[in-house]
Curated annotation (Swiss-Prot):
Active site: C396 (nucleophile), H527, E529
Sequence segments annotated as region (Amidoligase domain): 1-281
Additional observations: CTPSs have evolved a hybrid strategy for distinguishing between UTP and CTP. The overlapping regions of the product feedback inhibitory and substrate sites recognize a common feature in both compounds, the triphosphate moiety. To differentiate isosteric substrate and product pyrimidine rings, an additional pocket far from the expected kinase/ligase catalytic site, specifically recognizes the cytosine and ribose portions of the product inhibitor.
Protein name in the entry: CTP synthase
Domain Glutamine amidotransferase type-1: 306-554
Short name of one Pfam family: GATase
Family note: Belongs to the CTP synthase family.
HAMAP family: PyrG
UniProt xrefs under InterPro entries: Class_I_gatase-like (IPR029062), CTP_synthase (IPR004468), CTP_synthase_N (IPR017456), GATASE (IPR017926), GATase1_CTP_Synthase (IPR033828), P-loop_NTPase (IPR027417)
GO molecular function terms attached to this record: ATP binding; CTP synthase activity; glutaminase activity; identical protein binding; metal ion binding
Organism: Mycolicibacterium smegmatis (strain ATCC 700084 / mc(2)155) (Mycobacterium smegmatis)
EC top class, as a word: ligase
Sorted UniProt keywords: ATP-binding, Glutamine amidotransferase, Ligase, Magnesium, Metal-binding, Nucleotide-binding, Pyrimidine biosynthesis
Amino acid sequence: MPALRKHPQTATKHLFVTGGVVSSLGKGLTASSLGQLLTARGLQVTMQKLDPYLNVDPGTMNPFQHGEVFVTEDGAETDLDVGHYERFLDRNLSGSANVTTGQVYSSVIAKERRGEYLGDTVQVIPHITDEIKSRILAMAEPDAAGVRPDVVITEVGGTVGDIESLPFLEAARQVRHEVGRENCFFLHVSLVPYLAPSGELKTKPTQHSVAALRSIGITPDALILRCDRDVPEPLKNKIALMCDVDVDGVISTPDAPSIYDIPKVLHREELDAYVVRRLNLPFRDVDWTEWDDLLRRVHEPQETVRIALVGKYIDLSDAYLSVAEALRAGGFKHRAKVEMRWVASDDCETEHGAAAALSDVHGVLIPGGFGIRGIEGKIGAISYARKRGLPVLGLCLGLQCIVIEAARSVGITEANSAEFDPKTPDPVISTMADQRDAVAGEADLGGTMRLGAYPAVLTPNSVVAQAYQSTEVSERHRHRFEVNNAYRDRIAKSGLRFSGTSPDGHLVEFVEYDPQIHPFLVGTQAHPELKSRPTRPHPLFAAFIGAAIDYKAAERLPGMDLPEQFVPVEHSDADAPALEEPLEKSDVRG
């Protein structure tokens, strides 16, 4: 009789997170929080998201359907859950952290065309599942620093029972077979609904969801019960019995006040200890030092500031998820609570509309985006804030709108972006040379932007250099358009400074007004929100929230008047020639 195959006890462990009953239960946050707990126990953890949609990546998807696109250091356009992973683990992930059906099928079909399958009939099993498995198992390889992860947490997108998810679930089942059951753990997130008329929590949906999972060969090792309240012990015992799961593996996770409370919720239910025990991982106590400090900043703020996010996609807040979290983290830095006001950019197209939307906020953030809709509203919001000394932070498209507004303020009345008006006589924002084919429709749109981390050099003693405490920085990007260098000198007459560029000096990366002209009006072509962490707020967001706190404090001073340079100044077309005067003689500081 052949000997049983032995699996090495030192092998990287694989933990799969699946979801049942309904979508949007918080699988990504559950996986991220468990990853944070294991990391706090001294383990090396990495994470991956399997998305069952046919798109190659979310880069060309509608923000209203998918939410934000999270860009990694290596330039991959990934699911927003990868942002949760990076923030909770406090580590950078690569493009391999997100796998889609589109990627898998593209790879398999390309291999078939090259003849790599040697004439085999290419099928979902084994070819598609093998491709998925190879990407899952590749996560266990050593990283760039040569460190092999102790645990790979893989979130399977979608809901058990969805036809699109079946190949991924089958691949996960086969991974368990290949690495050994002792090296694999399945965590299933399910809904336990509360029926108000009868006053009952119902377990039947969870039972059916687990039955569907078991029908394809996967028995969960633990269950996350999502509910708006604690699930009592008798119901947990019932679910454990009916779903054939250890009672210790039935975890009640009621809604938490903050997403950063979830690790504490899971720890209170001893999920992390159960996982460590089942996977035979080294047991160390959780080091709560850093996370407890974060939670004190979350729940015991000493100040509150109101920030307006002026955007196009505010009907789905997930479209600006990383921006919102970066703003909150900037608040944590100052022990301040950030109240978000979601302002539709269309509402700020007129001065009256901007005043109605922004008159009682302490800062304005202009996020990235694409297309002409709402652009004049973003420019209107910047103009309103510039004239009143209201702190502004512009990201990507936000920088471009700051530049357009500055150009118009010094008489370049037709200033616009080639993206919004290809025939504008004054394209102060122009198409990047290597992006012209894509913009003209002669090349693929997906995956062709300027993506990933790029360096920038900052002007010494500038606002941004002081925020970063450095003159050399690296930020992630996602854009096709740039500031037109032919207009730099004319735009500079507004007082706007080009305070950061690419190392060769060609590409404008940061703009700002001198603090004597405006206390904090800064734009960056990058997406700094993607590098912010709750425990390590991004310097630009921390500086922005600090400026908002100062603005609020100045508001409270009795009898305070606006400095002269912040008093709104209107220019007629007849004034335009006078705007060529030296800055100190001009009113264009507005």
